[in-house]
A protein has these predicted regions:
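Substrate-recognition "cap/lid" segment bordering the active-site pocket of phosphatases
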Residues: 118-159
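Short, acidic loop-to-helix structural element flanking the phosphoryl-transfer center
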Residues: 84-113, 123, 150
Length: 159
């Protein structure tokens, strides 16, 4: 039996900055213009450093003094903006990813995704990219109470 391969998604398979950076800019604009929050300018490389963090950790590290209510609303705005971009077919996988996945699948590997994303985000991508062609499952951190990936892998292994 072949091993089961578990891939990260954002920044590994999915060229996330393509939709993440504009979505963050939208949320930052809302905080500045409608909430009067002094949000520092964020270069792309800083936004890229947040890939792999769950939403809560990202906002807590970036604007720790911001009230939770505003963090949640800004995160929701960014998430909605990303979903809109996926539905508008602006999301993209890195070049060559499909070929690699086709090769692995043809060699009998079972594959899954494990991501620090929200459940709704994973579902949108699953549908947009027809991910069932390659993957058995898309595990998101929201479903597991935002547990660390190491804990989620242990949970997955028990099923």
């Amino acid at each position: 039996m072949k091993p089961h391969l578990i891939f990260d998604y954002d920044g590994t398979i999915h060229d996330t900055l393509r939709i993440y950076f504009p979505a963050l800019q939208k949320a930052f604009r809302w905080l500045r213009e409608e909430q009067g929050v002094d949000v520092p300018e964020v270069p792309r490389h800083q936004a890229a450093s947040w890939l792999g963090m769950n939403t809560r950790d990202m906002w807590n590290s970036f604007l720790p003094g911001l009230p939770m209510e505003l963090k949640q609303k800004a995160a929701l705005l960014a998430g909605e903006a990303m979903a809109e971009q996926v539905r508008a077919h602006r999301a993209a996988w890195y070049p060559g990813v499909r070929d690699v996945l086709d090769t692995l699948k043809s060699r009998g590997f079972h594959m899954s995704i494990l991501s620090n994303c929200q459940r709704s985000y994973g579902l949108i991508h699953w549908e947009e990219f027809g991910m069932d062609r390659w993957f058995d499952a898309f595990y998101d951190c929201e479903t597991y109470g935002h547990a660390p990936k190491s804990g989620i892998i242990l949970e997955i292994g028990r099923t």
